[in-house]
């Protein structure tokens, strides 16, 4: 079974030859340390991202397209960039802060124009689709993450409560761009789409239910329908945090998979598999707060085995950390995770 077939089979809730494995992102520092290389410390790099996944025996890659434009340096030497959405931010390469938000006031929401989709080229998706047998996810943004990054998180949340109509309008405009982005990524060869949209704290959703039903869920439904009108592919949601109170809504929106399942936020994968495993393919749940970053390789092995036991039966599970292989993950722990997945994740070996 090829990597692409393995992931597609799991997403269809059937058992492949082995539990598929992969990461939504692998940070540059981790990749360079594992490979002994000095690839650029940037978010995405084809050769680095290919080599590190090959080294770990990973089955999928997740690539987006996030254009930004260099505006020069500020008085402190920080680089100033303009995103595709129109906000401007200062960046050190590993962090950023807004210097000019998407709109100065909510009164500008009506005059704000949806970004030009011609900015999206899909080059990395096209490269992976052409040269590798890995399953290729194309990632786009969701209404919450885009606006909290372009306005500031606190400013976004206040506006969602006090200027709900304007936030709804801005969300519609940025999601029009994201829908067009998804179409470009699919035409470039993406096999499925992931909507990256962090909507919850570790304690529960960012926004109250009545606001979610105004500025989040209807837009998810529209976005999924728009993507599927272009091509009938699986559409999944990535969100960190505690989603248990809104899992019914996630399913009702039309998502067919969920990534993160953050255990430190109380996401119990056995319970989620029991309640939602027929509707959602599950990706993630390997802890980053302690297990991958501070535990021993032997502890990592035991957690991987118990997670596979809880979630892999009947298909519908893909082994992954609950976010990304970040720089603070020791190489030995990543190798332990993926080696265990290769050995213990064989369906005919375990009898699942």
Question: What spans do the regions from the language model cover?
Answer:
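Active-site loop segments of alpha/beta catalytic cores
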Residues: 1-42, 82, 88-94, 106-352
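A basic- and aromatic-enriched beta-loop-alpha substructure that forms the phosphate/nucleotide-
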Residues: 75
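ATPase catalytic-site recognition across NTP-hydrolyzing enzymes
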Residues: 100
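Catalytic domains of carbohydrate-active enzymes, especially glycoside hydrolases
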Residues: 45-65, 184-188
């Amino acid at each position: 079974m090829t990597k692409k077939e393995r992931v597609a089979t799991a997403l269809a809730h059937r058992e492949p030859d082995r539990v598929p494995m992969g990461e939504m992102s692998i940070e540059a520092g981790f990749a360079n340390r594992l490979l002994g290389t000095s690839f650029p410390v940037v978010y995405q790099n084809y050769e680095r991202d290919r080599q590190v996944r090959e080294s770990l025996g990973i089955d999928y890659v997740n690539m987006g397209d996030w254009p930004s434009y260099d505006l020069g340096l500020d008085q402190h030497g920080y680089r100033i960039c303009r995103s595709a959405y129109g906000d401007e931010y200062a960046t050190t390469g590993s962090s950023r802060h807004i210097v000019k938000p998407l709109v100065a006031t909510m009164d500008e929401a009506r005059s704000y124009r949806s970004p030009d989709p011609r900015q999206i080229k899909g080059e990395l998706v096209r490269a992976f689709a052409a040269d590798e047998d890995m399953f290729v996810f194309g990632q786009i943004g969701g209404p919450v993450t885009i606006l909290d990054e372009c306005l500031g998180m606190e400013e976004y949340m206040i506006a969602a409560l006090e200027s709900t109509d304007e936030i709804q309008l801005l969300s519609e405009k940025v999601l029009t761009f994201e829908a067009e982005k998804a179409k470009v990524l699919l035409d470039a060869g993406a096999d499925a789409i992931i909507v990256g949209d962090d909507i919850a704290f570790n304690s529960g959703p960012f926004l109250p239910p009545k606001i979610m039903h105004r500025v989040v869920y209807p837009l998810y439904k529209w976005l999924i329908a728009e993507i599927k009108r272009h091509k009938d592919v699986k559409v999944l949601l990535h969100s960190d945090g505690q989603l248990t109170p809104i899992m019914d809504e996630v399913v009702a929106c039309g998502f067919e998979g969920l990534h993160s399942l953050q255990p430190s936020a109380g996401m119990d994968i056995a319970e989620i598999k029991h309640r939602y495993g027929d509707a959602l393919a599950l990706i993630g749940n390997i802890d980053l707060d302690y297990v991958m970053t501070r535990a021993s390789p032997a502890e990592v092995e035991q957690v991987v085995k118990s997670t596979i036991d809880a979630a892999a039966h009947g298909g519908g599970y893909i082994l992954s950390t609950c976010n990304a292989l970040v720089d603070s993950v020791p190489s030995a722990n990543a190798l332990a995770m993926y080696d265990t997945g290769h050995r213990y994740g064989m369906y005919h070996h375990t009898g699942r």
